[in-house]
Amino acid sequence: MNDSKNPLSPHLQIYRWQISSLISIFHRITGIINVMGLIIICLWIGLLFFGESSYELINIFFQSYFGKIFIMGFAWSYSFHLLSGIRHLILDLGYGYEIKTANITGIIVIIGSLVLTVLMWLIGRGLI
């Protein structure tokens, strides 16, 4: 039992999420996803040395519905991490700490990552 007169912190029950904290958390998560995705891509390229049949097996995966979701997710993760990293570099220079500016740059990162993902997808499909 807590018999002290100190107030107890309600912690997460009253915490209001801010866009800056979400961008920071997702920056870390996308960094991990990017490393895992690059490992998978390196393994895919490494399968070239084991012959055409093993390489075709991975190609079948990438042409499947799940494979396309993986590629799209990896493209979004890369785009988000890139734009969020640029945002963090600007913050490191001391700019953008005002609440309004921080919210606007956070929204720019989210929308920009989606736009870059669509552009990568269109370029990859040969539509642009």
PLM region descriptions:
Residues 1-128:
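Membrane-embedded alpha-helical bundles that constitute the cytochrome b-like, heme-associated redox core
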